[in-house]
């Protein structure tokens, strides 16, 4: 829908730049950076209501002040996000940045409420909240279909905010039902107690809990979000390239994220509690056994996705995006970017698996260090390849960054343990067989489609 109305040009670039930072936070929070640091601290806290309400209040105040600062003067952030845009484009971009930036506050509230629901093993609201954002954005695009591109940008931006509000509202019913809203309210009221002894005890416990939470939070964010930050930096660099480059990266990355989220992130999220418990009980053999099963499953699935995606990149892009303002030229470039992104699917996905070991051992600082090194190496690759390959160089550099991240994570995990996990000839032969079958089937399918197209073309259909 977005490709149909905005295409891949200056207006789509403006929106993707404006939405990039809020979307970065959405993806970081959604992939567990907040929950992995908040939930352990929340579970250990003896004053859960006070701790949760204070964490929520601190984040909301800080984010509100940032949003207000950007709303009052959005041009500086627009320049920071897209330094390569000319002055006229930056002036168009600034108010769109100001509107979209408020989504940061909304997405934090959604994530915070979702983390509380996870404590009660309630996942429905978190699972479906993302779809509400998409629904609101689609409705905004439908309403603005007959408007100018600039007007459509404003409709779409307000659609993002409406989606954020809808995401928050979706969480309220389960929060009330499970008594969590009442817990937050009581926690907030507890700060008004006049009992000096209780106040001193609560203050001491809160300081300890907050220190533990923030000690884990920042490294967890850095360690979990190297792919997202790399993509964010690529957007800024792409603003120096030809019009449409930011859009090509965005459209290709959206499709690339699908198998990563469906398989790698989902499996690592589900596996984390059992790995943490087994590590606590010194059951290393059990951990390695589970990691081995997950390894071969992910290698098989992600390899098949990569092969299929690369071989059908043009067809996938054409099917998803080529209509309205999205031209065949846009399809060609986006499909090439998508293919280069897919080269990094295996390393990025498998890194998610082995980083569980570091987080279960509470080595968030080591994970953050690895993430920063891979980011710097990826940034160097982007700056080196961009003059030669343009937007394609940025996509290739992103995949190289994933490879750096994977190698460094395996080094931290231990090469001997890693070699023990991947020793299974039977599993490798099965994966190789499936990959060969997929390649042959896709070649036959593409040949059949080509012959069918030529037949109907010469028949005059």
From Swiss-Prot:
PANTHER family from the UniProt entry: LIPID II FLIPPASE MURJ-RELATED
UniProt topology in membrane: Multi-pass membrane protein
A single GO molecular function term of this UniProt record: lipid-linked peptidoglycan transporter activity
NCBIfam families xrefs: murJ_mviN
Keywords associated with the record: Cell inner membrane, Cell membrane, Cell shape, Cell wall biogenesis/degradation, Membrane, Peptidoglycan synthesis, Transmembrane, Transmembrane helix, Transport
A Pfam family this chain is assigned to: MurJ
A single cellular component GO annotation: plasma membrane
Principal cellular location given in the protein's record: membrane
Gene transcribed to yield this protein: murJ
Organism: Helicobacter pylori (strain ATCC 700392 / 26695) (Campylobacter pylori)
Subcellular localization: Cell inner membrane
Protein name: Probable lipid II flippase MurJ
UniProt keyword annotation of Transmembrane helix present: yes
Annotated transmembrane regions: 5-25, 51-71, 96-116, 123-143, 156-176, 229-249, 258-278, 293-313, 337-357, 372-392, 402-422, 429-449
A biological process term (GO) from this entry: regulation of cell shape
Top-level lineage group: Bacteria
Function of the protein: Involved in peptidoglycan biosynthesis. Transports lipid-linked peptidoglycan precursors from the inner to the outer leaflet of the cytoplasmic membrane.
InterPro entries noted in UniProt: MurJ
Pathway: Cell wall biogenesis; peptidoglycan biosynthesis
Organism classification: Bacteria, Pseudomonadati, Campylobacterota, Epsilonproteobacteria, Campylobacterales
Family named by the database record: Belongs to the MurJ/MviN family.
């Amino acid at each position: 829908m977005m490709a149909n109305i905005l295409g891949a040009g200056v207006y789509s670039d403006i929106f993707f730049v404006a939405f990039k930072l809020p979307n970065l936070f959405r993806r970081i929070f959604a992939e567990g950076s907040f929950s992995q640091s908040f939930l352990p601290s929340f579970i250990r806290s003896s004053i859960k209501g006070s701790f949760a309400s204070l964490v929520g209040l601190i984040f909301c105040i800080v984010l509100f002040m940032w949003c207000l600062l950007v709303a009052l003067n959005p041009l500086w952030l627009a320049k920071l996000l897209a330094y390569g845009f000319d002055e006229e484009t930056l002036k168009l971009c600034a108010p769109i940045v100001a509107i979209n930036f408020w989504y940061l506050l909304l997405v934090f509230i959604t994530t915070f409420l979702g983390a509380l629901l996870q404590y009660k093993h309630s996942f429905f609201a978190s699972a479906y909240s993302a779809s509400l954002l998409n629904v609101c954005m689609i409705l905004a695009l439908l309403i603005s279909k007959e408007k100018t591109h600039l007007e459509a940008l404003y409709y779409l931006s307000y659609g993002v905010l409406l989606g954020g509000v809808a995401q928050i509202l979706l969480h309220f019913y389960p929060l009330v039902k499970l008594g969590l809203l009442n817990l937050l309210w009581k926690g907030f009221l507890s700060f008004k107690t006049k009992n000096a002894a209780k106040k001193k005890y609560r203050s001491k416990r809160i300081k300890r809990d907050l220190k533990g939470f923030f000690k884990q939070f920042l490294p967890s964010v850095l360690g979990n979000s190297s792919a997202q930050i790399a993509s964010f930096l690529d957007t800024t660099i792409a603003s120096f390239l030809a019009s449409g480059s930011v859009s090509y990266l965005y459209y290709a990355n959206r499709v690339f994220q699908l198998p990563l989220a469906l398989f790698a992130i989902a499996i690592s999220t589900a596996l984390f509690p059992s790995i943490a418990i087994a590590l606590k009980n010194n059951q290393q053999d059990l951990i390695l056994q589970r990691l081995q099963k997950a390894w071969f499953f992910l290698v098989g699935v992600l390899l098949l996705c990569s092969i299929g995606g690369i071989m059908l990149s043009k067809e996938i892009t054409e099917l998803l995006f080529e209509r309205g303002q999205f031209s065949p030229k846009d399809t060609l470039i986006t499909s090439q970017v998508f293919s280069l992104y897919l080269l990094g699917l295996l390393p990025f996905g498998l890194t998610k698996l082995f980083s569980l070991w570091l987080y279960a051992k509470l080595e968030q600082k080591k994970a953050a260090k690895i993430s920063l090194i891979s980011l710097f190496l990826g940034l160097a690759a982007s700056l080196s390849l961009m003059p030669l390959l343009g937007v394609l160089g940025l996509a290739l550099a992103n995949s190289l960054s994933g490879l750096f991240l994977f190698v460094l994570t395996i080094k931290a995990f231990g090469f001997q343990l890693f070699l023990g996990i991947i020793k299974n000839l039977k599993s490798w032969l099965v994966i190789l067989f499936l990959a060969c079958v997929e390649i042959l089937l896709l070649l036959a399918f593409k040949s059949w489609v080509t012959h069918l197209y030529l037949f109907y073309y010469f028949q005059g259909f």
